[in-house]
């Protein structure tokens, strides 16, 4: 089987879990531990990507440049990567990151808006970067239409396109259908990626399904030993928005049991998760009534802490806020609507 490409997101998606408050020294320590453990790629940025530090998304404890430079100092084998959301980050931000040593980038859009990634993907490809398309909130688009969006990203120059389960809402069958749809339209050399969240406790299971279906070329049956590279996102101790991402150390252990080539030291990952990352969590990254509600309602995982603050301020149940956000089909970038929803619910309770 073609080796897996494991990308750690502790230092990007994991920012959401601690309100973007990693210090430069913590970034350096975590990046060094991941590099030593053999991870292929390490993503570094504000939780909402380059230039995400703001009133709307939350201010970072340091700048993207400071975090990226800290990681670059300690990496010896891992690829330094970042993420950019068009409309938040710009090509100028990407140029600055590249100058600091970033060689790979994911361009992230809502699952129906691939067309806004054309300029950014094109620039990255033309300038020698590894570049992926990152179709967020993948549960909000059916498999065929999502695959059509992936094909657009491929046409702009993406080396890989992800099924991005930002809400942790996809079931295993949903992942299989979307990965299979990608296989039908993408060229054999284009890689397929999975970015799972653990809100329904399916982060690892969904990643396994993505590997099983994504590594096949064309219409071969499951188990066909021919391969396309599958990229899998995960994070130490699951550090990420909502109930977190697929826990890296758990996924690697499962990959080992499957006999998949991954290149990582599972014990070193366990140690980094337990000794370095988990002590940083001011709110446990786990499935609980609030994070389960994210997956149940299909809500953008990074809404969690915003919703918890609004619930406390206006005296409403955070689950009610999350379910209503899901009903209204709010997506990333609409964080300002969380307070509106909380006020609406508080008003109804008073009448």
Swiss-Prot record:
It comes from the Bacteria. Substrate binds at residues 12-13, 166, 195, 300. GO terms for molecular function: 2-isopropylmalate synthase activity; 4-hydroxy-2-oxovalerate aldolase activity; manganese ion binding. CDD domains: DRE_TIM_HOA. One of its GO terms (biological process) is L-leucine biosynthetic process. It catalyses: (S)-4-hydroxy-2-oxopentanoate = acetaldehyde + pyruvate. It is an enzyme of class 4 (lyase). Gene3D superfamilies: 1.10.8.60, Aldolase class I (3.20.20.70). Keywords: Aromatic hydrocarbons catabolism, Lyase, Manganese, Metal-binding. Mn(2+) binds at residues 13, 195, 197. The record marks 12 as: Transition state stabilizer. The active site is at residue 16. Residues 4-258 form the Pyruvate carboxyltransferase domain. Its EC number is 4.1.3.39. InterPro entries: 2-IPM_HCS-like, 4OH_2_O-val_aldolase, Aldolase_TIM, DmpG_comm, DRE_TIM_HOA, PYR_CT. PANTHER family: 2-ISOPROPYLMALATE SYNTHASE 1, CHLOROPLASTIC-RELATED, HOMOCITRATE SYNTHASE-RELATED. Belongs to the 4-hydroxy-2-oxovalerate aldolase family. This is 4-hydroxy-2-oxovalerate aldolase.
């Amino acid at each position: 089987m073609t080796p897996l490409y494991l990308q750690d997101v502790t230092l990007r998606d994991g920012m959401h879990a601690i309100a973007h408050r990693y210090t430069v020294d913590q970034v350096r320590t975590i990046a060094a531990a991941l590099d030593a453990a053999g991870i292929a790629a390490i993503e570094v940025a504000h939780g909402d990507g380059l230039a995400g530090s703001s009133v709307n998304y939350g201010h970072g404890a340091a700048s993207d440049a400071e975090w990226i430079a800290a990681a670059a100092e300690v990496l010896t084998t891992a690829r330094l990567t970042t993420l950019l959301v068009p409309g938040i980050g710009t090509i100028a931000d990407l140029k600055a990151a590249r100058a600091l040593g970033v060689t790979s980038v994911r361009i992230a859009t809502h699952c129906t808006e691939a067309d806004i990634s054309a300029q950014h993907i094109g620039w990255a490809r033309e300038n020698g970067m590894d570049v992926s398309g990152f179709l967020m909130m993948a549960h909000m688009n059916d498999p065929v239409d999502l695959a059509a969006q992936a094909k657009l990203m491929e046409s702009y120059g993406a080396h890989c396109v992800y099924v991005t389960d930002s809400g942790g809402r996809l079931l295993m069958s949903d992942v299989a259908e979307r990965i299979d749809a990608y296989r039908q339209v993408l060229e054999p050399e284009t890689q397929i990626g999975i970015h799972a969240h653990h809100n329904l406790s399916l982060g690892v299971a969904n990643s396994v399904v993505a590997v099983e279906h994504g590594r096949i070329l064309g219409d071969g049956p499951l188990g066909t030993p021919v391969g396309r590279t599958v990229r899998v996102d995960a994070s130490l101790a699951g550090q990420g928005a909502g109930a977190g991402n697929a826990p890296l150390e758990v996924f690697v252990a499962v990959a080992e049991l499957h006999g998949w080539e991954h290149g990582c030291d599972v014990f070193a990952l366990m140690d980094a998760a337990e000794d370095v990352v988990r002590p940083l969590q001011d709110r446990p990254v786990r499935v609980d009534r609030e994070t389960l509600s994210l997956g149940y309602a299909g809500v953008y995982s990074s809404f969690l802490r915003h919703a918890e603050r609004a619930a406390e301020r206006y005296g409403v149940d955070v689950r009610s806020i999350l379910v209503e956000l899901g009903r209204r089909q709010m997506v990333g970038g609409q964080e300002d609507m969380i307070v509106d929803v909380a006020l609406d619910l508080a008003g109804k309770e008073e009448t």
